[in-house]
Amino acid sequence: MSNQPKKYETQNIANSTEESDAFDIVTIPVPSEEPQESDQTEEHESGIEQFSESHAIHVEEQSDRSFSSLEPDSEQLMKEVISPRQVSYTPQHHEKQYAMQSPNDDSLAFLDKIKAIKESLQESMEDSLATVKVVLIPVGQEIVISFKVDTVLKYLKDYFSHLLGIPLSVLQIRYSGKILRNNETLVQHGVKPQEIIQVEIFSTNPDLYPVKRIDGLTDVSQIITVTVQTGLDRYQQVAVEIVKSDFHKPFLGGFRHKVTGVEYHHAGTQTVPKKIPERLSVFCRDTQTVFQKKNLQQTTNTTSTQMTNIGVYVSNMTDKLVTPGKYFSAAEYHAQRLKAVIVIQTYYRQWHAKIFVEDLRRQKSLRLEWETQQELRKIREKEEWVKLDYHRRHNPKTSEDFEFLYNALEFWRQEELKRINQSFTGAERKAALCELLEKETQIIASIGRHRYIAYTANQEAAIQAFLDKCSAPKIWRTPNGKTIEMDTQFTIRARELQNIYKCIMLKNISQDERLDVLLTLKHTVKEHECKLTQEILELIDREVDLMMRGVKHHNLEGLRKRIATLFFHYIKTPLFNPEVAKYLKVPQDPLKFYKKIYFCHSCQLYLPSTEFSISSTSRRIYRCRNCISLENEAQKRESFLKYRCLLQQLYFTEADYEDDSKIAFLMQLQDIQYLTENIWASQSVLSAWDDLSDLVMVRWNKSLEWSPWNCILLTKDEAAAHLNLTSIEEGYERSFIHKIKHKHILAKNYFSQIPVLASFILDDPEIDEIRWKHHSDTTPKIIESQRPPP
């Protein structure tokens, strides 16, 4: 027996139970190394001892990166050949028996038979093994084991279920992109014995049962014996340590054999890198305390001087004679420096003065240029306003334009009336007044003709806008700024009717094209039978008949206009065009319309609420917009265009502040007119400028929101200067401030009638103080009668 110690490495993978054959195969045993013996008898004794202990089974397996050995379950087969008595020999008993018996042929034959059976069992078990490289997904850890190709994969899954701590039903094995079932074997998928394959194990529920790394498999090693040929007939057994690690081998280069195709890597690729030792935590006083040490050190500087001496010649051709200069004292030195400083200061101040003057000159030129541009801008705006006024007079289109024309007519009539009253008397005056009345009548008739033309054009534009609104697709705006459009069956129907209406309204088309349009219209209208559709069909047949008889186009204008009008009524019917129901002024449900109509005492008509103009202070509804406009054209002939511009500019100014102001947007046209005329006298409070086109209404205190009691009427330039003030008390005199506050109190008294604005006024402490100061005691007095005592 050899006394050499056996080398064992710590086994990190837990062995499975001996009850299952597959688990014995998966088990990775502790490798052992057998010492070599020269004596043949001792070699057989060692074989018997190792066989009785059933620990040494050599399985040599080769892989690209790691090797593993699995212990075959040969114990049961060996028991059939050898009895328990023969297997349970101790080393001492065996030595005594060997000393008593002499070696003979029977014992040697028996040992050879045992060894042959053992080798045959090992070969039969090794032939059915395959090297399986298991990759854990998603951690990427690689584990190399040996597994029988004819064993069901349920045992492999049970093994890794025990290692990973994951239920068996959650784990899945994948090979070549296919999921392997529990009752399948590797042979069924074409895996042969002694073959190297790679499978992947992953979890079907990674959130609840994630696959993690197995830390116990990082340093598993094995020692095997390899026979190496050292000479012609010489062989030597070398112990090789195989380190199994999940370290991913990097490719650092190599070479490939052209004949055999074997790829050889460098040593750095085949060696696991050494671990960097972790730095120990140091928390002692030396690492947290700073010690300073200060030492002064003067280095030596060796110098030498060359001079003439015996045997040394130094040339003096380049030498020069230095004579001492004039000596001056410290006072003279400082006086000279002071003189130089004065010179520098003089030139610097001169340069600074030039720069300052040039800067002032440049600012002045910029200011003059800016003022010139502002004057030109004002002149340009004035000219544009005059051009717009002229265009409105000659091409009126909107109600504001006709309102402006009637205002100009009234202004002209007042001037002519004043001139006639000053120039004529008696019969001449009456004749001049009659002539003035006749001219006024002609002008009113001309304005009426322009109004009819504008009404016709506006009516066509309104119809087209109405049809565009009905046929428009549904639009949504996404958070990223893009728009989404969707067409419904109702919008598609509305678009088809709109296209037919446009074709009907086309002019200067041929007779065949007109017949095609009428035929399309006829097929569209035939879908519904009612009185309106029957009338449209009759008119279509009449036009076709007249066209076949050769009637000219200008004689068919009335008929075509009637067809277009009836077809527009067809489009406005919700039964034929469901999309139009959303845009009709008169709703289909009478109950909804009942609460929104009012009676006009002037035209005696019931109209919707949108046809009435209501001011902020009005409490009842008397006349509609048309009656008020008609009364203005007949009597006052006032123009509210400038007040509209003033109110619109106020809206824009308050919107730019972005401070959630509310009162300014509650103001109506009548309110801004009253505020301008009655409170501010239609002129600037600073310069008394009375042209409303140049006036704006801004905040008095810009830190508070605009209101009738926090505003001031100024020109545009004055408003810009007012808004630049940091303090009102510093910018204006006390008398002017008192005057403005008085106007604010007048505005509060007027607009306090509005319930919405009254809620803002009641919260003002200043108005409460004024009311308390002028409050009179109205409590009833109690007079007690005093009777004389009896």
UniProtKB/Swiss-Prot annotation:
Protein's UniProt keywords contain Cytoplasm: yes
Species the sequence originates in: Macaca fascicularis
What gene, per UniProt, encodes this protein? IQUB
Kindly state one GO CC term assigned in the UniProt record. Answer: acrosomal vesicle
| Subcellular location as annotated | Cytoplasm, Cytoskeleton, Flagellum axoneme; Cell projection, Cilium
Start and end residues of each Ubiquitin-like domain: 130-206
Q: What is the lineage of its organism?
A: Eukaryota, Metazoa, Chordata, Craniata, Vertebrata
In this chain, composition skew of type Polar residues spans: 1-17
Q: What is an annotated GO biological process for this record, any one?
A: flagellated sperm motility
Designated name of the protein: IQ motif and ubiquitin-like domain-containing protein
Its job: Adapter protein that anchors the radial spoke 1 (RS1) complex to the A microtubule of outer doublet microtubules in axonemes. The triple radial spokes (RS1, RS2 and RS3) are required to modulate beating of the sperm flagellum. May play a role in inhibiting signaling via MAPK1/ERK2 and MAPK3/ERK1. Additionally, may play a role in the functioning of cilia. Not required for the functioning of tracheal or ependymal cilia.
Q: Quick one: where's region Disordered?
A: 1-49
InterPro entries this protein is in? IQUB, Ubiquitin-like_dom, Ubiquitin-like_domsf
Q: Does Cytoplasm count among this protein's keywords? A: yes
Assembly mode? Component of the axonemal radial spoke 1 (RS1) complex, at least composed of spoke head proteins RSPH1, RSPH3, RSPH9 and the cilia-specific component RSPH4A or sperm-specific component RSPH6A, spoke stalk proteins RSPH14, DNAJB13, DYDC1, ROPN1L and NME5, and the anchor protein IQUB. Does not appear to be part of radial spoke complexes 2 or 3 (RS2 or RS3). Interacts with CALM1. Interacts with DNAJB13. Interacts with DYNLL2. Interacts with NME5. Interacts with RSPH3. Interacts with RSPH9. Interacts with ZMYND10.
Q: Which residues form the IQ domain?
A: 337-366
Q: Which UniProt keywords apply?
A: Cell projection, Cilium, Cilium biogenesis/degradation, Cytoplasm, Cytoskeleton, Flagellum
